[in-house]
Amino acid sequence: MVTNDKGAVSIKHAVMEGLARELWEHDEITPDAENQLIMSISPGPHATWRCCVYKEREILRWRIRLSENLDASPYATEPNPNVVQVIDPACEECPLSTYSVTDNCRLCLGKACQNSCRFGAITMTESRAHIDPNKCKECGMCANACPYGAIAHLERPCRKPCPVNAISYDENGICQIDDKKCIRCGQCIHSCPFGAIASKIDVLDVIRDIKAGKEVFAMCAPAIEGQFGKDITMGSIREALKEVGFTDMVEVGLGGDMTAAYEAEEWSEARKEGKKMTTSC
């Protein structure tokens, strides 16, 4: 499956694996260990996934903080309550959402785009139509009217999938997340091609609890069985997790079955009384 976040996920996994190994073997993660991890992922002298090694290493520093369940920014003066956070140095400051005329424009006689615009934002040049971004209200009427489909809606990948319009941008074009609107769905995380949005991770806290001798139960969705090949079963996954240090594994589908049973009883009573009720997923 082709996705926007394949490169970012591989870097995330490299950071998480390095930190987990360090904590498991040495009981703590020192600044020196963090620097060694950064240099192992971005050794230089040439950059491999961003413009320069210095940018790569700064991005890794922010990612390490998120992997340690800390706020991404080491320079923040106030705590960030959101688990979904922006890695500022990774943000490419993509062009803001706008409608743009492409080479498909034939400068036709009908000028449906211009006639459909209620704000006078479209004029004609010698080669194509032109949209004035200062007048455009992004209503999309011109794009719908063009018979050639020559007008494209260029929208930032992080903002496009957000169902609650929680993403905006500062004066420099850096992505900002409105914590009051954000529902932590993670759509922006997977949509950003530069991996500039990520979430806090509590894997290291789990490792600390296991090493401290606490009872820690792994809760796995039934779908986990399909991620490791046909010869891997829920039973083998359970044994592997217990070998790692978990007390036991519980399939969350069991909780779903229990919920369905309780809801069936609740619905039966509601039906007798002529009431309506919703169900969980």
Feature-to-residue mapping (PLM):
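Iron-sulfur-associated redox domains of electron-transfer enzymes in respiratory
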Residues: M1-R63, S67-N69, S199-C281
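Glycine- and small hydrophobic-enriched segments that form the cores of compact globular domains
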Residues: V101-G186, H190, G195, K200-D202, ...
